[in-house]
């Protein structure tokens, strides 16, 4: 079975070899763990963001940038993501399934290290995936860098030595944060299908694109814009082999949610910033195209809503 930690570590090695080119800042801590600053203080940009996204997906995806029009008005950068291992790349690796709260430090953990720590265990049981590697790679969405105690905790949970852990760190409101969160557009569709009860192992390949949101000064506002990129302008194409996918397609798009129609930050604020008051169905791409190769049929659902996306991004024409 492929090891997503092994594959991701090869990407990390490239990042370390060309740290200055990617404008990232590696730090070796007292316990010999490695923390790579990708946006807390470092001035990393698009290229580091693409690699960060690949690491989040266990090295099982290709990422690239392109230029598309938003609402037929302005050309804007989009991220494109493709994978031939959708369930593993998105659920076993990319899903932010590890809430890290240790020694006063909080971060959302993504990436292949989750597979070693089984965070959460149910995810790996459902897709029947396990990783066994002596090095752990984790991606942290946080506005601070972790200290030795945090890295010791991650190592312990993963069953490896602290010297065999590397963490990539980027805040939500940073260029890398914008890229890697927009790069979750495919994951949104795969996760939604998993929550609906679809066996995601039937998904053969996946492709998605979403605009890379502008960086906001306020982290809470940035959380809104980064989600809106996929919720209102994310497009995903899935190649599926059976599994009665036709019954699930209409339920995938974000427009099926009761919270759809307003910028995410507005909805979140109305809910008094309580995630439990939000409809989880909102975390989905705007539109999906699904080709079922077992029947030869292709289904579409949802639509792009550029108006809400641009409202969220806060574009001002001068």
From Swiss-Prot:
It is an enzyme of class 3 (hydrolase). InterPro entries: METHMP_CycHdrlase. This is Methenyltetrahydromethanopterin cyclohydrolase. The keyword Disulfide bond does not apply. It holds the Pfam family MCH. Keywords: Cytoplasm, Hydrolase, Methanogenesis, One-carbon metabolism. It comes from Methanocella arvoryzae (strain DSM 22066 / NBRC 105507 / MRE50). It catalyses: 5,10-methenyl-5,6,7,8-tetrahydromethanopterin + H2O = N(5)-formyl-5,6,7,8-tetrahydromethanopterin + H(+). The keyword Hydrolase applies. Belongs to the MCH family. The gene is mch. GO terms for cellular component: cytoplasm. Catalyzes the reversible interconversion of 5-formyl-H(4)MPT to methenyl-H(4)MPT(+).
């Amino acid at each position: 079975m492929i090891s997503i930690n092994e594959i991701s570590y090869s990407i990390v090695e490239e990042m370390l070899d060309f740290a200055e080119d990617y404008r990232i800042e590696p730090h070796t801590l007292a316990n010999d763990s490695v923390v790579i600053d990708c946006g807390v203080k470092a001035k990393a940009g698009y290229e580091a963001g693409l690699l960060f996204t690949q690491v989040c997906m266990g090295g099982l995806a290709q990422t690239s940038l392109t230029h598309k029009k938003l609402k037929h008005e302005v050309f804007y950068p989009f991220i494109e993501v493709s994978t031939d291992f959708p369930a593993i790349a998105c659920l076993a690796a990319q899903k932010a399934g590890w809430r890290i709260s240790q020694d006063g430090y909080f971060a959302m953990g993504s990436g292949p290290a989750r597979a070693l720590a089984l965070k959460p265990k149910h995810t790996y049981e459902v897709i029947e995936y396990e990783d066994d590697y002596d090095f752990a790679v984790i991606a942290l969405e946080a506005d601070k860098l972790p200290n030795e105690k945090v890295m010791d905790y991650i190592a312990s949970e993963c069953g490896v030595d602290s010297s065999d852990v590397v963490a990539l760190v980027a805040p939500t409101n940073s260029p890398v944060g914008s890229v890697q969160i927009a790069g979750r557009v495919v994951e949104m569709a795969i996760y939604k299908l998993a929550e609906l009860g679809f066996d995601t192992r039937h998904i053969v390949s996946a492709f998605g694109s979403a605009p890379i949101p502008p960086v906001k000064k306020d982290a809470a506002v940035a959380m809104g814009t980064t989600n809106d990129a996929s919720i209102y302008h994310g497009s995903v194409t899935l190649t599926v082999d059976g599994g009665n996918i036709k019954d699930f397609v209409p339920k995938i798009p974000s427009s099926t949610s009761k919270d759809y129609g307003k910028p995410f930050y507005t909805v979140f604020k109305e809910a008094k910033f309580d995630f439990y008051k939000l409809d989880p169905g909102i975390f989905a791409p705007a539109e999906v195209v699904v080709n079922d190769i077992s029947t030869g049929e292709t289904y579409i659902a949802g639509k792009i809503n550029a108006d809400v996306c641009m409202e969220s991004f806060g574009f001002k024409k001068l």
